[in-house]
Regions:
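Short, acidic/small-residue loops that bind anionic groups at enzyme active sites
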Residues: 1-3, 60-70, 107-122
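Glycine-rich phosphate/diphosphate-binding loop of Rossmann-like nucleotide-binding domains
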Residues: 7-72, 81
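Residues in well-ordered beta-strands of folded domains
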Residues: 1, 38, 155
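Glycine-rich beta-alpha junction loops
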Residues: 6, 39-44, 70-74, 86-89, ...
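Glycine-rich phosphate/nucleotide-binding loop
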Residues: 79-83, 87-172
Length: 172
């Protein structure tokens, strides 16, 4: 969950994992999606009561491939196809990631523009930087699917522009 349900019971997070796994199979064509539980460590006993209880439910036979806990630093590394979390924690991860990406691109741009060599390097790598930045651009994604409801619902970011809304409609 990326923010729709901020107070969740462990069984709901398991349901989010089921829906996320089904979405990855049917929409993203991932044959056997791996599901991780977002937590503060990879060990089964890590985390708060909610995380530990959710882990206990997820390690029971489920209709998805549970790979254990996943730390926030691994969220973008592809360690899991689906990362299950309550909406509060998922939204904090999402917004922190957006902020860090924005900060890093700003630092790189500022650093490159400080010298003639940097400006030349930026010019030579312009297309590469543009492609990398585009791969992290939430505008191009449009929004996140709201699973478990009847019909196609895409939740767009609160600060979405016209392009993001267009992409959200296209995604639906």
């Amino acid at each position: 969950d990326a923010g729709a349900n901020t107070d969740c019971q462990p069984k709901w997070i398991v349901q989010f994992a089921m829906m996320g796994s089904a979405y990855m199979r049917r929409v993203m064509n991932v044959e056997k999606p791996e599901v991780g539980l977002l937590n503060i460590g990879v060990e089964a006993a890590k985390g708060n009561e909610q995380a530990q209880n959710t882990y206990a439910l997820m390690e029971k036979p489920q209709p998805f491939a549970f790979i254990g806990n996943v730390e926030a630093r691994d969220a973008l590394a592809g360690k899991a196809d689906v990362i299950a979390a309550d909406g509060f924690v998922g939204n904090v991860l999402l917004k922190n990631t957006e902020g860090v990406i924005s900060l890093i691109f700003g630092l790189i741009k500022g650093g490159l523009m400080d010298s003639a060599k940097g400006k030349l390097a930026a010019l030579l790598a312009k297309d590469t930087f543009r492609n990398i930045k585009r791969s992290f651009d939430s505008t191009e994604i449009g929004g996140a699917p709201l699973l478990g409801v009847e019909g196609a619902v895409i939740k767009a970011h609160g600060n979405s522009n016209a392009r993001a809304i267009f992409c959200a409609i296209r995604q639906a």
